[in-house]
Structure formats: C-alpha cells, structure tokens
Amino acid sequence: MENIGRQRPIGVFDSGIGGLTNVRALMERLPMENIIYFGDTARVPYGTKSKATIENFSMQIVDFLLEHDVKAMVIACNTIAAVAGQKIRQKTGNMPVLDVISAGAKAALATTRNNKIGIIATNTTVNSNAYARAIHRNNPDTLVRTQAAPLLVPLVEEGWLEHEVTRLTVCEYLKPLLADGIDTLVLGCTHFPLLKPLIGREAHNVALVDSAITTAEETARVLAQEGLLNTDNNNPDYRFYVSDIPLKFRTIGERFLGRTMEQIEMVSLG
C-alpha cells in the first residue's frame, strides 16, 4: 500500500508553458517520478489579472490535480505563488506544496556572500514584492533589488535565446542591478532559465539562481522527508494537460522541456 502512495504523480502547474522548465528540472533530479503538468494556456497571462481572478483560476487547477490523485504539488509560476500560494496551501491541507519563490529565495540566501541579491521577474511578481518578503523573513538585513524584465518572455518564446536583440535587452535590465553591486541574481520567471548562458556572460562574477533547479531540489528533500519518494519506477509516466493548444505550442513546449512532448491533452476548467 505504501508503494502505491509513492507511485502517485507530482502535480506541476503554471499559467502557461514556462513551468515546463520546472518539469525538466524535476525529470533530471527525480527520474523515477511520474509527473502531471497543467498549463492554463487559454487564460495566460495571469500577470495582468486581479488577485481574485488568479485565486479562482488557481483553485480550479488545484481541483483538477487533486482529481488526478497527486502526492505533491509544485507551483511553477511566480505570479500564482505570489498571489495565491497561501490559499492553495489552505486547500491542500497536509499535502506538500512547493513553489518557485520560496525555493528561489532560500537558494539566493544560501548563495550570496555580500548580502546583495537581485531579482529579475515579470511586472506582477516584482509588484507583489514576494521575493523580497521571502528573503527578508529569513534575513532582514539583505539588500534586495528587483527589476521587471517583461520583454524577455516573448523573446524566449520566439526562440531568440542567443539573439543580439535579447543580449541588448538583458544588458539594459541588468544595468541597475549590477550598479547596486549584487553578487547573486534570481531568475524569477520560469522562462528565464533558458537565458541562463546569455545572462551568465553579461553578469559575470554574479551567481545565478535558477528557481526551477532549486524547486526540484526542495521537492526531492520534502518527498524524502515525507517518505513519498518513488524509488522503483524505470518507466515514468509524463502527462501534459493544457486549456488550449495554441499555435507553436509543441515547438515552444519542447524547447522548454528539452525533449519531445508525447501526451498533450486539452481540458476545460471552470
């Protein structure tokens, strides 16, 4: 019976497809885990919506994942984590719920040497102040500098990961953070890990915190602690659910995932 509990999937969700960077990190860190992903591609972006709407949409996704009997959830969306994280945890009770902001903040604090941390994220995540709050909860003396970097999202989706336009945009966004002397930079949007090589070159001597990797690490730690790690599954099942299959979805999705997406199914929520 205990083994059946361990075989249950991890549920990962996002407002769109960026959260597939989290799925990729989970596949690499926990290769025996079954994973269900839900991307709300019909209603993306969440960043421009009200708190009540984001909470409402998030609850619908949580219900969907609970119906699929997941053993843990990963909020692979900075906006949802910032706005609806608390409500989601209230609903799921004792189930482990991980999120990119908590994991990213924790990793940034463990990485910084001079206590100056930069965050690049979308407008909503920056305006929510969620990263600064999570960091200051653990260390109130840390200087946290945030920079909204909304133009990077469409550039990543276009596949311009090494394009000169992207490089110039990154440089522009990094200027104020580097001027403040940060030694650690959190990639606070699920699209940004794809720009890690480029950002690393433009922000040399700055440690990059990839919240997809740190969330996967945290998931592994919590599952082990709860006795939920799947250690007996050489053929994991990966399922991808979306609320719409927009143009180029598979192409962009496979770029994020770093492999082919076989089981994509469309479902409507709400």
Curated annotation (Swiss-Prot):
Q: Where does substrate bind?
A: 14-15, 46-47, 78-79, 190-191
Instruction: Return one Gene Ontology term, BP aspect.
Output: cell wall organization
Stored InterPro entries: Asp/Glu/hydantoin_racemase, Asp/Glu_race, Asp/Glu_racemase_AS_2, Glu_race
Q: Which Pfam families match?
A: Asp_Glu_race
**Top EC class per UniProt?**
isomerase
> Which Gene Ontology MF annotations are present?
glutamate racemase activity
User: Which Enzyme Commission number(s) are listed?
Assistant: 5.1.1.3
Function description: Provides the (R)-glutamate required for cell wall biosynthesis.
Q: What protein does this entry describe?
A: Glutamate racemase
